[in-house]
Structures are given as structure tokens and as C-alpha cells.
Amino acid sequence: GLVRDDGDRVQEMHDRQAQAPTRRIPQRAPAAPSAPTGLEGLREAATHCRRCPLWEPATRTVFGQGPADARIMLVGEQPGDAEDLSGHPFVGPAGQLLDRALREVGIDRHTLYLTNAVKHFRFERRGKRRIHTPPQVTHITACRDWLMGEIENVRPQVIVCLGATAASAVFGAGFTLKEHRGRWHSLDDGTRAFATVHPAWVLRQGEGEAREAAYRLLLEDLQRLVDDHPAP
């Protein structure tokens, strides 16, 4: 669960980084020489993260972006190819589909804090192309302190998890998207949260009716967000 305790959690994050490697997260190393404070401090520290091997082939760390006091936080899986190259979350094809869905339900993207459960692009090469590969549990676990730090600093009223990876990072490994999609849950600190499909999953449904049906699921859940938590 999530418990808001900014100072303690940031300190614990660095205490754990300084420990010897554990079986759960190999190659754990300090993210930065001093404990980060605030979103910008976390962002800078994350650029030095070596907790898992994903940093090495990736172009850069892709940290979250958006207002530091955003009312709504969207959490995705990991950066894609476009995000890895640009350094900005949700700017590739999935991000463009998300933008379309947000516009349709009347949500201004610029009011949201957008981030991912994993901060580096995991991929495999096929010729000159870099093909997305889902992150493993070790990658999600290695990045979880960064996500928790973002949540604790932004303190959103609502968290929307896009896809199963984001949901497992926020709710825990036992959470299943099939069973809980679109249903509100309260985190330990009182933050309301729910999970919906990832726009990248919508794109993978091909063309025609299958994709439209998948897109309607995303729209339906975002509309629920608007209905249950209207902008002030």
C-alpha cells in the first residue's frame, strides 16, 4: 500500500540504495550522492539510477512531467521509442491516442501529471528498429521508489493507472486489470485510484471494430473520472 511520509520514504530510499545488493533487485546502487528533495531533486537523482540494467541501452531516463500540484496523476507502463528519444512521457503513438481520448472527455492534458511505472525504455532490436518489450517485475520494483516519490510530492487527489504494469506498481502484484478495471479503490493514504487499459493496448487491437471497442473502454473509464471527480 501507499503511506505518505515524504521525509522518511526519501531517506529510506537512499538507505536501501546504499545497502549491499539483494536477491530481489540486483546491481542496486546509489541514485545520487545526497537525498533528493522535491520533484526536481527526484528527477535529477533518477538520471543517475543504476538499480537495474535498463539504463544502459536506453537513451535517457524519462521522468514524469506536469504540474507539481496536479489534481490527477496518470501512470503508464514505461517510455516507448519516441519518449526515450525525446525525454518526454506519452508523446508517441500511444500518447497521441491518449490525447485524443482526453480531449473527447474534456480533460486538459496540461493539468495532469504524467509518468510511468518504469523510467527507462525496455526494448529488443530487430534490424534498425527498437521493439517494445514489457518490463519485468524486477524493473518495476527497482523503479517503485521513484514513482512513490512522485506521488508523495504531487499528492494527487486521483491516480489513474494505464495498463496492468502501472496497476501492479500502484496496487500491488495481486491486482488484476480484468477484475478491477474502472473500479475505484482507496490507497492507504486516502488517494482514490483506478485502473484502465493502456492506449498502447488499444493500438495493438488492429483496425476496425476491435480497436474501436478497446478505445471505448478507455473512453468509458476516463468519462467516469470526469463524472466522479469533476474539475473545480
At which residue positions do the language-model features occur?
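A polyanion-binding, active-site-adjacent surface
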Residues: 1-232
